[in-house]
Amino acid sequence: NITDEGLKYLSGIHTLNLCSNKNITNEGLKYLSGIHTLYLNWNQNITNEGLKYLSGIHTLYLNCNKKITDEGLKYLSGIHTLNLSCNKNITDEGLKYLSGIHTLDL
């Protein structure tokens, strides 16, 4: 599996799939801000704190991440397409942060 250390070499990538990667943490996400499309489904170590590094991404898949809550959504308002399906800690309260998103999957 890819670790945070390896992510710093991927800045020019257009689309990156890191689904179910147990070694990626919030620290590694700071290297991914220039990526167009990012898949982070089923990543158990990604929390609200890491989402602040992802605001410049065009398309983001965050399906099934148990540690993402309403509070973290405030960092995602500039994203064009966002998939948050199967995130049990996202409630009506968090939707106030997502009004500018073009395509949203809950």
Language-model segment annotations:
Residues 4-8, 26-30, 48-52, 69-74, ...:
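The feature encodes a structural signal of leucine-rich repeats
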Residues 1-2, 12-24, 34-46, 56-68, ...:
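Concave beta-strand-loop units of leucine-rich repeat
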